[in-house]
């Protein structure tokens, strides 16, 4: 007997529960469910948001959003930890109060556990590459590192891995820079 898995769509994603403490993501028609992120994850994410928003206050070139629903295709809807889109992208990326399409930068903060690590490092990396996300960061609170990937011909290539004693800059947000240790400050 051959059983075929149903390919899920954005309509299925929209019908899933909200506010139950889980994250529901559909990647190429397959459902991924994860728990809400832990405290360290949230502190690192809050630090990143603060640093980037501080830069954007004096350089209003775009918008940063945490934990948005991002519809990439009819069979892929994800909830990245952070998304940045430029002002000139707003009309094409914001549709009916949701993000659709290709933002300038996507950031995932890795949560502990092999399934989480595999999803951010393999599954989402492949998804973001296939849909031409220009820049993707994987932030690892455990090792206090940030991997910066850039898109080249629908492949995300590891540009650099930064440690806590290094300086972070990005092509996605011109003029932005910070010391990596600022991202990993606990309180």
State each model region's role.
Residues 1-187:
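Gly/Pro/Ser/Thr-rich low-complexity, intrinsically disordered segments predominantly at protein N-termini
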């Amino acid at each position: 007997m051959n059983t075929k898995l149903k390919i899920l769509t954005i309509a299925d994603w929209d019908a899933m529960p909200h506010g139950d403490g889980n994250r529901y993501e559909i990647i190429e028609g397959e459902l991924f469910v994860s728990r809400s992120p832990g405290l360290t994850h949230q502190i690192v994410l809050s630090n990143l948001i603060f640093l980037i928003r501080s830069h954007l206050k004096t350089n209003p070139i775009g918008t940063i959003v945490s934990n948005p629903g991002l519809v990439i295709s009819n069979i892929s809807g994800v909830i990245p930890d952070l998304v940045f889109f430029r002002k000139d992208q707003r009309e094409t990326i914001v549709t009916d109060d949701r993000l659709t399409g290709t933002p300038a930068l996507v950031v995932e903060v890795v949560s502990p556990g092999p399934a989480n690590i595999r999803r951010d490092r393999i599954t989402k990396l492949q998804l973001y590459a296939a849909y031409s996300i220009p820049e993707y960061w994987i932030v690892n609170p455990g090792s206090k590192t940030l991997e910066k990937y850039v898109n080249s011909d629908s492949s995300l290539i590891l540009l650099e891995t930064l440690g806590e004693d290094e300086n972070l800059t990005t092509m996605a947000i011109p003029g932005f820079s910070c010391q990596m240790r600022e991202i990993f400050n606990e309180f």
